[in-house]
Amino acid sequence: MTTAASPAALPADWRDFFALTKPRVMTLVIFTGICGLLAAPGAINPILGFTAILCIAMGAGGSAALNQWWEADIDAGMKRTAKRPLPSGRMQATDARDFGILISVASVGIMGIAINWLSAIILAAAIVYYAVIYTIWLKPRTPQNIVIGGGAGAFPPMIGWVAVTGEITLMPVLLFAIIFMWTPPHFWALALFVKTDYEKVGIPMMPVVKGEASTRRQILVYSILLIPFAVAPWAIGATGAIYGVSALLLTGAFAALSVPVATRRQIEGDTMKPEKRLFGFSILYLFALFAALVADRYLTPLIESAA
């Protein structure tokens, strides 16, 4: 658990609170939530739709703040995270904790009152999953932390979908499964080129515990397993060819980029270009796949009516 920031820490300004929400990560969370909302059958009042996305963003930001509050000591020992508000001493730990709790609770309450309570319950589960199950229990204990903890980041499209429909059907479950399967190769590619950071602070990431070779093989395995999950919405007839072809091409490219990662070994002075390329593409992949989902939802009917 974190210790308090230095008593001499300056009062945090809004930029520090914003940094607590992990805005770069939140961008992907918000985008997939919007795509889930837009791809869902039916319609939602634009103001309510905006409210639902705002709640998803608040919930993601709140759980991220609680994650940084708990891991401040760990972050201080890692080059990649040492400049965050807590380890750098720009903020008191209690401020970060209280901020995280406040916006997390508010997000669930507003979602339930304004949208529906099923989406609020799923949002609450996502917050607890990330801030408690992943951060406190899984991450410091098992190299499978990313595999099991992947569910935390897989909820947003499901929440967006349920905000519109008010029910859980197969399609939002598949959207959850896509991100769940995408998470291990995405994060393990990162873990390969920041392995020394995790070793230094004692976090049992897969490359640290099981070794580089095992991690590389598992990246390829999960990338291949992602293919049927990504194509499944098309296979069950829930989407058209715009999404289906996009899913095949994008996920095929993802798997192809995993091959050089799986078949090489790090050498002295290695710049880790294949791993960095895969990590970068994995982010682009999720944006493109979910954009194709929305495009399919609105363009397919137009194409069919014009035919």
UniProtKB/Swiss-Prot annotation:
Instruction: Name the reaction it catalyses.
Output: heme b + (2E,6E)-farnesyl diphosphate + H2O = Fe(II)-heme o + diphosphate
Recorded hits in CDD domains, A to Z, give: PT_UbiA_Cox10
Known pathway: Porphyrin-containing compound metabolism; heme O biosynthesis; heme O from protoheme: step 1/1
Recorded hits in InterPro entries, A to Z, give: Protohaem_IX_farnesylTrfase, UbiA_prenyltransferase, UbiA_prenylTrfase_CS, UbiA_sf
Give the E.C. number(s). 2.5.1.141
Which keywords label this protein?
Cell inner membrane, Cell membrane, Heme biosynthesis, Membrane, Transferase, Transmembrane, Transmembrane helix
GO CC, sorted alphabetically, is:
plasma membrane
- What role does this protein play? Converts heme B (protoheme IX) to heme O by substitution of the vinyl group on carbon 2 of heme B porphyrin ring with a hydroxyethyl farnesyl side group.
**Record protein name field:** Protoheme IX farnesyltransferase
Q: Please give the organism.
A: Erythrobacter litoralis (strain HTCC2594)
